Amino acid sequence: LEFSHLDPLKFIRKFFINRNKQKQKGGRMIVAKRKPFEEIKTMLKDYKKVLTVGCGTCVAVCLAGGEKEVGILNAELSMARKIDGSPIELGATTLERQCDMEFLDELENVVDEYEALLSMACGAGIQFLAERYPNKPVFPAVDTTFIGANRDVGWYEEKCRSCGSCVLGWTGGICPVTMCAKGLYNGPCGGTDNGKCEIHQDQPCAWYLIHERLAAQGRLDLIMEFQPITAWQNQKPRTLVQPGYEEKKEAG
């Protein structure tokens, strides 16, 4: 890394960005998949000049919205619109991240050249892009599917649904919200069959796995502790402000 004449905070940020680039497997990420082509095409039917914006982090690793995918989508859209007799001019750029305002500022000098923006980031990035440029229609090109772990190259498994009330300490590190088809907090339903889920027979019962894990750890007594039902009606868009940054948030 070049670090001469570099602000210390920017140097730290750059260090972690480059470190994350080098992680190709074994990481945690937001996993997404590209929307059906016809859906994307329909969203853009009234626009003739669109900037497709990729994201170089999570969606790039899972091959849904990085620089390569931006090029592929633009080629498909351009060809389809020509066939329909309604050609479209498409720009292409890929930001380091769309969930970081600092990187969204890079579009400031070009965004006015386009009628709309087509984002290939996750749902958080798409919303942040729309917030940064509120006068431009912003359309999603991908569907955000889950927070997952990279089991192997090209193989992602859902592990967390960001419920905001983690119970992994009581369930042996196995998430009942994610792994149980019914999201049960206090033991299995009556349909579990030989350790299999009644809804998905190829899927193990989450509470069978929890029982086996806790038993192996000598902590089976935890399975008898009642976990209160999550009050989903109290859910709202969540914000996390790290200690020491409260004044900055209040000022902003």
Placement of each model-derived feature along the sequence:
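Iron-sulfur (Fe-S) cluster-binding modules
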Residues: 1-92, 105-117, 131-170, 174-252
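Short, well-ordered alpha-helical microsegments
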Residues: 125-127
